[in-house]
Regions:
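Oxidoreductase cofactor-interface core, primarily capturing Rossmann-like NAD(P)-dependent enzymes
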Residues: 2-32, 38-45, 65, 86-88, ...
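NAD(P)H-binding glycine-rich loop region in Rossmannoid oxidoreductase-like domains
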Residues: 37-104, 116-121
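Short beta-strand segments at enzyme active-site cores
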Residues: 110-112
Length: 171
């Protein structure tokens, strides 16, 4: 069964890699009907590259919850890979996207968090620690029968790209 997948923050490193992988890896490609990329920067170079691969690039406009819900419904998103943007308003933008996923009744949502966020101290590393609050808000939908999103939410903690890049250089 092929799925329509929506990936957020495709203008960033992680979002770009996820969308690219879905359309280029044979294991995933055969199970994907289409990929939509939500982005704060639709004219970014990474968005142009993804568009060449077949990703439908859609601008994400924070503060317009109803519009975001409609967008998710219009593209027919059956699965959402929710990646917080590298943005000063990351927390608010992500909270709004969590709510949009619920209202759009997307049954399969994967929240991509940051490895090590549980070890961060709230006072010393507030940006990293905020991922814990976002994870909690996202997982609060689990078991919520008023939305399909409550069926199977999942959190994946991914190492920040710069850490992974540094790690690979030492190999």
């Amino acid at each position: 069964m092929s799925r329509t997948v929506c990936v957020t923050s495709v203008d960033g490193h992680t979002g770009f890699l996820v969308a690219e992988l879905l359309l280029t890896n044979e294991t995933f490609k055969s199970n994907i009907k289409s990929v939509t990329g939500l982005t704060l920067h639709p004219h970014a170079e990474k968005c142009k590259e993804l568009a060449k691969l077949g990703v439908k690039i859609v601008p994400h406009e924070p503060g317009r919850l109803k519009h975001t819900v409609q967008t998710l419904q219009q593209v027919g998103a059956e699965a959402l890979c929710l990646i917080p943007p590298a943005h000063k308003d990351k927390f608010d933008i992500t909270m709004e996207m969590i709510e949009a996923a619920k209202q759009a009744n997307i049954a399969n949502v994967c929240f991509v968090s940051s490895a090590g966020c549980d070890l961060a101290e709230r006072d010393k590393q507030p940006h990293l620690r905020s991922f814990i609050d976002l994870e909690a808000a996202f997982m609060a939908s689990k078991g919520d029968s008023s939305t399909s999103t409550g069926h199977s939410p999942v959190v994946v903690r991914y190492p920040p790209p710069f850490l992974m890049s540094n790690f690979l250089k030492w190999q």
